[in-house]
């Protein structure tokens, strides 16, 4: 039907007017087609063109340019065009974008920056080499754009990008993700792309072309739902006044919004800040419906989306026929579906659809409900009752035919709109600095090898790189006259003055090493014949200028034969072992029988002397992608350095040593740092490739060399490459541009950098500095912890402004070459990290008893005294109270009034009489029973209550019978703590570290305590013998104030050696547990109240009921089942079997003076706290089903969580076989009934100490005259509540507020106001 505008044009009959209108229209069409030629220059079929026009993309019907996926490519270009209009007219950083696509962005001559990274192999051909960056991206622009790559990355990438680049404010990003893949539906735009679902993921095929396909995991589709990226961390800084570390919660929020959506291509904008974004993200019009289920089971229904128009047509068709057959519906369905749409439905889906409409066709569509039209008043009044009765009847008998018909027509709209979700990440590791808080220096971000030369780019800004650490001048510095005092010494190398200046040194200083020996910049001079090849004349000329003319060298067949033998027999290399057998046989034969000479130039010099500068200058002068030279490097890191310094040459110019053997080299071969290559490598290379005319070897004869670990290899018996080829080196450049003069001279090297040298030593590893470790294991562990770690020997080629060198027991084993390599890495600052024991007090403790050294592994060091600055004590400030003053006498008065007389509360024994736990005449002190080790009545009551005597055989039987229970406990513990599927490999370094921690903790005791334990340190002290003591303590639990005295707690005194051994085992498993521990579980071990407070604020949910738990007789209830659990857990951590067996032996045969103890937990056995905590977790998750996101806290037998757990029915079958009995409590999470944990109350404002318990404990200390000993600790506990201010009114009851005010008042009187509220928090 023509519109009114079209009708007006059709009413014009004058030929001239029509011609003029057509001419005007043609001009506009021509202009539009010219613009469309940029976006869509391809020939697109009719269906594709129609689909593109729906997306407002024009197709030129006369275009003949073909493309495998033209329609999808046109959408990509259109997205770039949209981005180009959105970008500001200022420099922008383009990520993952080819320079050739700038024309779609209409960017003009704006100096944009291109940074690309190789995410997948095809990126090698996609991006220009000079735009490739190898390390973390540094963005210096306000706006950036990521092109069609974000869907291959993880959400953390957005957080990293914004956190590491403080200038970045806006990020545009295009992604290619079909939204229908979220529901595993076929493509909604089959003319543009198709989707395959295979192998647990989906494959996006643009234009049905497999060559352009991308494979995705379903989790990649989450990019379509993210609305905000939230990263939370705590910024720890040192208070300049108090010197304490103060944590400030911080948050980075990046808001994301969908800007445009064209098919599977979507444009998003990411803006720094917490902004609004639509709750629902719409990608396409809702045009499909799903049918209700008519049959059982569910899969036998047409429960897939069907086009609403098609469904309506089929519905009307089946209801227009008097008699409907299956053939009719199949035929109509085939008629309505185009041929290209047939593959959208499987035969089974078509069958289910036909069955659905067959049912609908046979159901009665005539309404059989009561008709109100023209009915009587009585009928109208009773109609609702009749309707309800009918519904009730149909509920039992089933619906009528019309009711079924209506139910069958309740179609649901199938939508591709998605609800927006937030991506939230919280940093847990307190030692990990946040990028926004401590951006590393530029020198720390990039590793430079030897020298670096800047290169100007003509039309673009280069990707930001770190400044070169060891620059070498491009021009020869002018000769400076030597000082009169130095002139006598500098005459020693006057003949080499020109060569020295060609290397960038003045050579006019007399420098001496620490032994007083003169350091000469040129050393190890040899006279060799000169014989230059005809190739590379410019390079030969450059080498002659620095006295490095090549010489003719005969290849040593013995060395090449040994190397060829190792290659043939697969003794060395990784790639070489995978080569075909014929290739390896041929390689070995050439090594054995080839005899030849080759022109060689051997360049030796100290690190940073500029050995490779001339070579790199020559390679930069070559044409782009020249085939003149091949550079072979020992490591991938060194290869990357050469690629960055000589970017004009193709990537295959630079090869690692194995690729250099497999792939033929060019006629000029450079072996950089050849001392790190396997012995015999240069000879074997020349023997196999006769096209090599010039061999250049650069290295340092003073640094570490390759060490062949396979002692069966033939090359293991050869002298190193350095030792053999040194005879062909004309001289050694004993000077450096890298190290400052003081450091260079200490290493016996000449240097002219007059900068101060800083050397420090501590036990702390700094963040951001490269770490050098003596061995591979330590370096590997440090690297896994996020450190930039190298071995002493493997750091060759590294240049950094400052490095830290780890010292341990392996350091003295390193050779002089290795130590020289490590010490020469830094420019001007070295930090030594000493992880071993030190200090005079340490050795005093070690010598105080004769047995400590028998089981402690230690090495002695001399500690350099450090000057300590004096801290000025801040002036005391007046504290403003925010609670009304209360009468302190009324807090404990109710307990005093109910308290019975002394002997009514004491325990009584016929043999020993009354116990003596109620002491003094002070009624407040009498509230707290005082349990003492010398109280025999209490001691025997405790033994009767806490200990059970049995035999070793009964314990072993108990242990064996509970293995199945132990398995169940560990399975649930494994799931709760998210441990890996496979057992954790044993880490010897971590074990040693834990061992050192246990030893350090023990030796931190005062000398008197260590001497008192001399008997337990005796090797003759029986391993399984235990001495029992009664723990002396004041019982301060609020629920026990003024109550009858209860049995106390025992302390078990074991032999010291097994205590430390099993303590090491527990600490080792704790460290491993912390690696995998989920963030919603908090274990109060080595944590502070501030840590608990921070965690509770971030994780605890106060909306429902909370749960807490304690146990009855927790220690003595840990029977054979818990021991089995401990053993299985230890085996999962690959603890050595002899340690596990000895632990089982100790637990099943623990002897006291009464006999063998039943299997139980004993305080003092080593792993008490860790074992108690882990047993509590295992028991809790075995008894209850706990959702994965529930916040949980554990410490020993105490635990709590923010939701009530669901009991497992299966637990009832095993609870009788477990000795543990829990005491669960439910909390309403309102004032007076919040969850409690270890004396802390978890409130919406944070955790606070139980005010009544804190007040009672403080009163006991005050009345005993011990307030000065506990005031500081109690002030810290009360401070968390005090600093909440008036917020306390919302979390405390009247009685709790009363106790809190009285506690604070007493602490103020004790001069602890600065602890209650730090100086920085005062008004």
From Swiss-Prot:
Residues 1104-1211 form the RdRp catalytic domain. Its EC number is 2.7.7.48, 3.6.4.13. It comes from the Viruses. This is RNA replication protein. It comes from Strawberry mild yellow edge-associated virus (SMYEaV). Keywords: ATP-binding, Helicase, Hydrolase, Multifunctional enzyme, Nucleotide-binding, Nucleotidyltransferase, RNA-directed RNA polymerase, Transferase, Viral RNA replication. InterPro entries: (+)RNA_virus_helicase_core_dom (IPR027351), Alphavirus-like_MT_dom (IPR002588), DNA/RNA_pol_sf (IPR043502), P-loop_NTPase (IPR027417), RNA-dep_RNA_pol_alsuvir (IPR001788), RNA-dir_pol_PSvirus (IPR007094). It catalyses: RNA(n) + a ribonucleoside 5'-triphosphate = RNA(n+1) + diphosphate; ATP + H2O = ADP + phosphate + H(+). Residues 734-867 form the (+)RNA virus helicase C-terminal domain. Residues 432-486 are annotated as: Disordered.
